[in-house]
Amino acid sequence: MSKSESPKEPEQLRKLFIGGLSFETTDESLRSHFEQWGTLTDCVVMRDPNTKRSRGFGFVTYATVEEVDAAMNARPHKVDGRVVEPKRAVSREDSQRPGAHLTVKKIFVGGIKEDTEEHHLRDYFEQYGKIEVIEIMTDRGSGKKRGFAFVTFDDHDSVDKIVIQKYHTVNGHNCEVRKALSKQEMASASSSQRGRSGSGNFGGGRGGGFGGNDNFGRGGNFSGRGGFGGSRGGGGYGGSGDGYNGFGNDGSNFGGGGSYNDFGNYNNQSSNFGPMKGGNFGGRSSGPYGGGGQYFAKPRNQGGYGGSSSSSSYGSGRRF
């Protein structure tokens, strides 16, 4: 594809992670299947750099987001006789967040203003899929809105599409959106991340493949209830009115402790809004999948998946 024909939409939004591949699946057979829904600008089955054995997952990149949507709407997919699981690819930066790879149907929406009603949330988020439930959280005692809400969809892909797009405006105001995790999911994801010491469930270390020794679909990484549980300290929402603490103890935007107080204000936390650090979407010159991070492949000329993250084109620093 020439530069003049390069897609205008960020590559990150046009890419699908394909898990659960047969070890017999090749780049060609993967391409043959997924090009039914659009033009593929890249397609790769990830392999061990030494043995060349498939790691059981790959990536396909479409020319447009519309084609990605078409492919996701055509689920389930079967490649070489095996049902595979396509998911919207998570950037290396976002993959550092606990629960980034969990499959959930509920989102947390923070920073919403007091005059925001259910219809404002519905009007905005229904473009991403069918909404089942909208909950605007209020203080049990005073009934005052607490500045955050939960939206539950009928399909996890709606959530995945929302969270990779970063910036959302509801009722004229920017808001923060995250996957809503149960207390158990948050604790499990946090402990799992600490235990891995950076090698990552989706690669990271040179020896790591997807799921660290082909754990795809077994460790609960792609399952899990929606819902929300609160911080490891037992905070949560409701109870004694201690605010939304679910993301507090991991150094996220939502602060340490009670990120949102009962008036729905940020507690001296800076926002993510503004220019993205480090050029999160990178460029084609850095290879089809940017740096050596989780859920992403290294440029092919650097051999394989995982390994060093020093060449990453997906920014730096954790925001969760």
Curated annotation (Swiss-Prot):
The modification N6-acetyllysine is found at K3, K298. One of its GO terms (cellular component) is synapse. Residues 218-240 are annotated as: RNA-binding RGG-box. SMART domains: RRM. Sumoylated. The modification N-acetylmethionine is found at M1. It is found in: Nucleus; Cytoplasm. It comes from the Eukaryota. GO terms for molecular function: G-rich strand telomeric DNA binding; miRNA binding; pre-mRNA binding; protein domain specific binding; single-stranded DNA binding; telomeric repeat-containing RNA binding. The keyword Iron does not apply. Keywords: Acetylation, Cytoplasm, Isopeptide bond, Methylation, mRNA processing, mRNA splicing, mRNA transport, Nucleus, Phosphoprotein, Repeat, Ribonucleoprotein, RNA-binding, Spliceosome, Transport, Ubl conjugation. Residues 4-94 are annotated as: Globular A domain. Gene3D superfamilies: 3.30.70.330. Involved in the packaging of pre-mRNA into hnRNP particles, transport of poly(A) mRNA from the nucleus to the cytoplasm and modulation of splice site selection. Plays a role in the splicing of pyruvate kinase PKM by binding repressively to sequences flanking PKM exon 9, inhibiting exon 9 inclusion and resulting in exon 10 inclusion and production of the PKM M2 isoform. Binds to the IRES and thereby inhibits the translation of the apoptosis protease activating factor APAF1. May bind to specific miRNA hairpins. This is Heterogeneous nuclear ribonucleoprotein A1. It comes from Mus musculus.
